[in-house]
């Protein structure tokens, strides 16, 4: 699909950057010569817009060997960022998709500034081409054929091999994020814990990873009472899924991802209202993020060791379901008083974290649609984070900045730990109250990470969006897929 060329050569469409500067860039000046000065006129008449995310279409009318040019407004160079570029290109690729364009090129060097080099632009362009044109996988009987871009060419004077490599990495990041989106959007009668495990196994086999899928009896033998308690009310069997990627000769410095895999959450006996229950098919967004990251890792083969653990079940009501006031024993041996059956994700993750440590994880990052509290605190654009290790958190933060997936650190104080340890009947309680809800959930998980360096990512607000946006339609976003993968790719770098 991707090609790299030094010059334009008969493309259907070429994408060109337009900055809000007094002078046209050298690339636009060269084009303007072919247009006999008419581009300058269009700029002066505001027919070509330099505003951020503005898309202006110009027909060549035979003046060049390209049929149409799409000029992408990027605003002022001084405020130009990777986020600006992602948003603008996302809109551009959507426009091409609507126009059913099959052969497009990007004048890569026109997007390059002191802040962003050609490799950065190539990576983002290929990534966004996939993200921006993603379409919901529906179950409608009258499915329409998807329009795909068949050929995409980067026009640049830079080294073709390096640019092609950046295009490939960007494409892999975008495609894997879309894989996660599709998982999150799947209905709960289709994506059960069993089906999620089957998907994970197929992924592992495709990329020659080791894997384990623990069944209920094996979980009982290992004492995974927290996950098993959540599963008590279900007719669907639980699964503890583990994918193991060995990127080094020695099994050291193992990064452990733990993704919440609750395939549907009614709240259990602490029953959600109807408004709160609709959409809970997406409560396995953390599992999807982890699997998306493992897809990228499988494709790119970084020299790191990585474990992905997914505790999976649904949380439903029945005569056998666990109840408020129950006391359960986790795999770690710590006992937990259940005060809220709708705080089930942290119970599943508790055993997932302990199991990841048992498999050899030296560093832990858990990802979960964990609390409504994080949405109240940070909104729908920023992922909440907590940690017991600032050095590991800084690496996660840098990865999130590179991928434009913002995170914000929330605190863990000793008084927070006291609140999750204040049960009269057990070592911990799973729901100390609504105050500081997001912090309480993360603090609870920290009790199981213990001294292992750990970062918690609460994607309850960022995993899905209600409306279409520059990088895709309403629905699942694939939050944290690219951040997790980038963390692995950059892990340990100074």
UniProtKB/Swiss-Prot annotation:
The active site is at residues 272, 346. It is found in: Cytoplasm. GO terms for cellular component: cytoplasm. The keyword Hydrolase applies. The keyword DNA repair does not apply. Mn(2+) 1 binds at residues 265, 342, 344. Binds 2 manganese ions per subunit. One of its GO terms (molecular function) is metalloaminopeptidase activity. CDD domains: Peptidase_M17. It catalyses: Release of an N-terminal amino acid, Xaa-|-Yaa-, in which Xaa is preferably Leu, but may be other amino acids including Pro although not Arg or Lys, and Yaa may be Pro. Amino acid amides and methyl esters are also readily hydrolyzed, but rates on arylamides are exceedingly low; Release of an N-terminal amino acid, preferentially leucine, but not glutamic or aspartic acids. Gene3D superfamilies: Leucine Aminopeptidase, subunit E, domain 1, Zn peptidases. Keywords: Aminopeptidase, Cytoplasm, Hydrolase, Manganese, Metal-binding, Protease. Its EC number is 3.4.11.1, 3.4.11.10. Transmembrane segments: none annotated. Mn(2+) 2 binds at residues 260, 265, 283, 344. PANTHER family: CYTOSOL AMINOPEPTIDASE, LEUCINE AMINOPEPTIDASE-RELATED. Presumably involved in the processing and regular turnover of intracellular proteins. Catalyzes the removal of unsubstituted N-terminal amino acids from various peptides. Belongs to the peptidase M17 family. This is Probable cytosol aminopeptidase. It comes from Bacillus cereus (strain G9842). The gene is pepA.
